[in-house]
């Protein structure tokens, strides 16, 4: 198998819904965010990423590096109009960051909210074609739809429904 060159840095991408520059102290915000500050001190900070008002299209842009309309995610993944720009999934013709990193030997892991598979395909029985493991990630831990119960979340590890951890 292909392995990254010795000394190749880790790649950590963080996407937070409903968050702006004013929310993070590393960008001058008033909220103290020491862990994000440490990540920002040791890596790159981007200041010009186009986000949409919706989570699925923003995720599609970030993972593909392309406009959300061009990859089939005009709105949240709950909707499939049949038109190419709004299929509720990232088009197969659009490679993801995880697929490209995997091709270069990187191990990839997605954590948290996915919301990039049509709602009818985001259950324990699949189909799994648009789930993280089928879009280039080696591992996944999180919830598939746009929201989950905060006290009794519907959590998945890889492609398998799991019981939430006890708190």
Model segments located where?
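Formylglycine-dependent sulfatase
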Residues: 1-167
């Amino acid at each position: 198998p292909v392995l990254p060159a010795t000394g190749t840095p880790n790649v950590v991408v963080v996407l937070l819904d409903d968050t702006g520059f004013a929310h993070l102290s590393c960008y001058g915000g008033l909220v103290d965010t020491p862990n994000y500050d440490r990540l920002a001190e040791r890596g790159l900070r981007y200041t010009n990423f186009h986000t949409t008002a919706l989570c699925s299209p923003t995720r599609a842009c970030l993972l593909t590096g392309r406009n959300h309309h061009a990859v089939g995610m005009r709105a949240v993944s709950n909707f499939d109009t049949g038109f190419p720009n709004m299929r509720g999934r990232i088009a197969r013709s659009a490679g993801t960051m995880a697929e490209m990193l995997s091709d270069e030997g990187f191990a990839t892991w997605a954590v948290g909210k996915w919301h990039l598979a049509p709602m009818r395909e985001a259950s324990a029985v699949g189909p799994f074609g648009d789930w993280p493991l089928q879009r280039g990630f080696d591992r996944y831990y999180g919830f598939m739809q746009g929201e989950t119960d905060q006290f009794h979340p519907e959590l998945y590890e890889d492609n398998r429904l799991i019981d939430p951890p006890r708190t």
